[in-house]
Amino acid sequence: MKKIILTLVAIATILGLSAQTTEAEKSLTTQSKDTLDGWKTGGIVSLNLTQVGLTNWQSGGENSLSVNGLLSLFANLKKGNSTWDNSLDLGYGILQQGDDEVRKTDDKIDFTSKYGQKAFKNWYYAGLVNFKSQMTPGYDYPNDSTRNRLSDFLAPGYLLGAIGLDYKPHEVFNLFISPITTKMTIVNDQTLADAGAFGVDPAEYDDALILVSSGKKIRVEYGGYLRALLKKDIMKNINLQSKLELFSNYEDASHVDVNWEVLIAMKVNKYISATVSTQLIYDHDIDILDSDGRVGPRTQFKEVIGVGVSYKF
């Protein structure tokens, strides 16, 4: 029920904000559709730094240094009745606290390429390819002297291909719907694959605990896919980007994978800005160990707040 409510809230939020497009925006968008063909490129890069230094501090605490970087790029082509949209989002963050080793706080690779051919009015026949992964290994730290590797580049990696309809009423909002989607989960690490991480088939052992077959490194699913994207200046110097992705495996349509990302960029001047980013994930095939020892699918949530240097181009 929580999952359904979160999904409905996400869709309502995106559609509601999209409906608030002003007449000026509509006029500008209409003009660009009629007159502008060719490439449109741009992006944003930001670097946030937080540092705490303590000397003889009676209240206690630890020195710390945190760095978070974000790069978001797009390159879109419009030519006649054809469109080709490409986007790349990269994020990385590290934390050094006290005498602990450097730990990762953020790591993201997200690439999407979508080609469309106009069908009627604001609808396009379209094909989409999406790739998600991370750059470096990820760990958890059960105690000060132990760390367990949980992930790595292509462990997991997600490759999704979809064919469907793309709704593009204006540049602010975009909705892609596909009844024909292939989702491939890649776990290119045998230890993680043997453990059945990220939903792949785990290794099999006989009664003497001798390995019979190794865990599968690839899992393929077929289902339906929805992707809603909103990019809007909600106030002067405040930009909102929201992306909602839903995938339902036809073999078990009652469980919907959810990926909802939000980025709010608040500009102070040409270079200084504050950013707030959140990501909510639910995947029924991923089991997560709770602090109380229970294992099962859980709603994952991440938020990153930072103030630093940014540049929009």
Indicate where each model-derived feature is located.
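Repeated loop/turn-to-beta-strand initiation elements of outer-membrane beta-barrel proteins
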Residues: S82-W84, N122-Y125, V172-L175, N237-L240, ...
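Outer-membrane beta-barrel translocator domains and adjoining extracellular loop/strand segments
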Residues: L54-S59, G98-V102, G138-S145, V187-D194, ...
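Sec-dependent signal peptide cleavage junction
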Residues: L15-I44
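Extracellular loop and loop/strand-boundary signature of outer-membrane beta-barrel proteins
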Residues: T55-G61, Q96-E101, S145-S151, A208-K216, ...
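Residues on the lipid-exposed face of transmembrane beta-strands in outer-membrane beta-barrel proteins
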Residues: G43, L47-L49, G69-L77, F111-Q117, ...
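Transmembrane beta-strands of outer-membrane beta-barrel pores
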Residues: L47-G53, K79-N81, L90-Q96, F131-P137, ...
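Outer-membrane beta-barrel "beta-signal"
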Residues: T299-F313
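Outer-membrane pore/translocation modules
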Residues: K104-G223
